[in-house]
Amino acid sequence: MLRFTHRGLPSSTRFRNIFVRLNHIYVPWFYAIDVPNSKPYLPTYQTLHSPKKFKPFSVDDSNRLEKASKRQERRPVLVNEDYLFKVDLSHMELSPTYWEGPTYQVRRGVWFDSSNQPLSSDLTSEIEGLYKQLKFDDSNDDPTTTPPAESQDIFRLKGKYPVDKENEGEQKNGSSNKDENESTFKFILFANKQTAFLLSDLDGGKLQLAFLRSNLAQSLPINATMITRSYKYSSSATTKQTSTSFKAAKTPQTEVADGSNSSKSRSIETKLEKKVSNLFNLSDFLQLFNGNASKDQDDAQSLEKQMETDYNNADNSQGANASSKIEDGKNSGASDRQIRSNRRDVDNLILCVHGIGQTLGKKYEYVNFAHTVNLLRSNMKKIYNNSEKLQSLNTAPDYKSNCNVQVLPITWRHSISFQTDAKEENIENPDLPTLSQVTVNGVLPLRKLLADGLLDILLYVEPYYQDMILQQVTSQLNKTYRIFKEFNPEFDGKVHLVGHSLGSMILFDILSKQKKYELEFQVDNLFFIGSPIGLLKLIQRTKIGDRPEFPNDLERKLTVQRPQCKDIYNVYHVCDPISYRMEPLVSKEMAHYEQTYLPHCSEAYGLTSKVLEFGENIWKDLPGTDENNLQSKKTSPEKKEVKLSENLTRMLTGLNYTGRLDYAMSPSLLEVDFISAIKSHVSYFEEPDIAAFILKEILSKHENASEIYVKRKTG
């Protein structure tokens, strides 16, 4: 028995009508990933050629873009993972929602070339206008239907549309030597309801046109470019482009025939060399020392890698896997399963502030803080989805699939133009030279790298620049928070801050001076990662706490600071030369005790887990080492724990509910210090252990510890 609704139609009929109507309006939309329209802070940037690589938006995003386009809405349309990106329909551009980043061309997918890429908006618009003149029978869904006999099937194009060359260099160099008529499409011939051909000339006459009208031309187009009014996704394309950075590490090594120690040692050396090379993957980092690292080609390749990961972190397979035939706006590939929103509920907002080295982003595209924060967000989601323990800490209704945490970058350095920047003239003091003019020429690439990376610390020590930095970061924090609230008006959760390197010092000072640098939100957890706070506050004769530890601290002219937040964490790698402890600044007694160690995440798949596995494997292969020796190292007696006094416990729990501020990443069995020192300071945001720790602390309920046990240092 059919159940009728208030509109007088059976509910099942209404559902079918709604779904058909949804199919009818569905048109896939795409965004470029290879050539940016613009780059932030590079006003001189110009595109040399049109983008050739496009990725599809999800079905939900495409539907909303299509509706907004028809309504001619001026407000940006939020798209992709967590709506972290937006589309400006007036300029057909995709850009980040909350931070500065490259903008990319957006296209409405109606006509596609032989590479399955959407044609440009201008060309598509003109072709569609001509296509409608053919007046195909809407009731006939056969794509091979030819134009009516009385209709004209070939038209001259009004616009100037360049012929795409596979070899960009050939196009660029050859354009000046060829006639304009040879380098642009002038005509279009419609072969059937789904296929057409673009031609630059009609030199072949009637014979060429007759061939293009035949079915054979679709398999072997001659002197023409075939385009189709359909889009088909091949899942193998994504697989081929997938990066396999650790593939070489899995290659079986040649077995050593004899069992001598010397042969085994040589095998170990070979294994060590190859595994270290693959493990740390320093090729990109070492390019910083290469004078050619800032070449346009290198920048384009690295930016394309970031684009494919950052702008496409969401499960866009729902849009990509939809094989769509566009016939008068109809789509046969969309399904109700694919039509879902990228929006998710967020109860915890994390804002990350970068530190030293971010000026490198102006010169080397692959040193990009927004990219590393996107990796942190991605790691958090992957680890959360695989961890029942983390899910059990989440009280949200959708805890199974949503960690309810959002992570956004705060990129402040590019917004400040210091007079000490390498080649910028000193406007305030024109008699002073630029930084490049006082730089010694010896080992120039290394000097430039160190200047770009370490100069910000020297700038921060100077009061004038320090105030400029604090004002700018405060402004960026408030701006990002306001934008987030604008697009997420229902958000009423907690805000947490993460500071990396100098960024941690900046956050420490902002939260310690809230009357001068006021934030528009309360801070819950404050994470310092790879932080030099311990050193800089020691130089400033500043202790950390709510009040002086001893009454005569004030008489000794010691400053005591306490950031306005609930809990403070100081996380670092033992090999990081920039990091320093903070607990001894709370009480000198803590200098006699070890820091606590970051728990190793069993779901981790990054550098830490690979180092641990690698060190254990190498240890087993060492001559004279057996399983019993290795096991004895694991089961060696632990150091005896000492209980802290009530006064010290109260002081520490006033800064962190656990009573511990310093958290070191677990050391591996095999430390390669010279490599670790280079890599450790810049790879925190890529570490799954860091992502898991931040997630755990944010989702956990905090109750102050009544007792604190520590381990005394040895030696």
From Swiss-Prot:
List, as start-end ranges, the regions of compositional bias called Polar residues.
311-324
Instruction: Describe its function.
Output: Probable phospholipase that hydrolyzes phosphatidic acid.
Any other noteworthy remark? Present with 736 molecules/cell in log phase SD medium.
Family affiliation: Belongs to the PA-PLA1 family.
Q: Which residues form the DDHD domain?
A: 519-700
Q: Where is the composition biased (Low complexity)?
A: 242-251
Which InterPro entries does the record cross-reference, listed alphabetically?
AB_hydrolase_fold (IPR029058), DDHD_dom (IPR004177), PA-PLA1_DUF7131 (IPR055555)
Q: What is the lineage of its organism?
A: Eukaryota, Fungi, Dikarya, Ascomycota, Saccharomycotina
Positions of the catalytic residues: 501
Biological process (GO) annotations held by this record are: cardiolipin metabolic process; lipid catabolic process; phosphatidylethanolamine metabolic process; phospholipid metabolic process
Disordered: region residues: 161-180, 242-268, 311-340
- Quote one Gene Ontology molecular function term: phospholipase activity
Quote the protein name from its UniProt record: Probable phospholipase YOR022C, mitochondrial
The answer to whether UniProt assigns keyword Hydrolase to this entry is yes
Q: Which PROSITE patterns match?
A: DDHD, LIPASE_SER
Gene Ontology CC annotations of this record: cytoplasm; mitochondrial matrix; mitochondrion
Source organism of this protein record = Saccharomyces cerevisiae (strain ATCC 204508 / S288c) (Baker's yeast)
Query: Which cell locations does it reside in?
Result: Mitochondrion
* Transit peptide (residue range): 1-22
Which terms are listed as keywords in the entry? Hydrolase, Lipid degradation, Lipid metabolism, Mitochondrion, Transit peptide
UniProt keyword Hydrolase, yes or no: yes
Q: What is its EC number?
A: 3.1.1.-
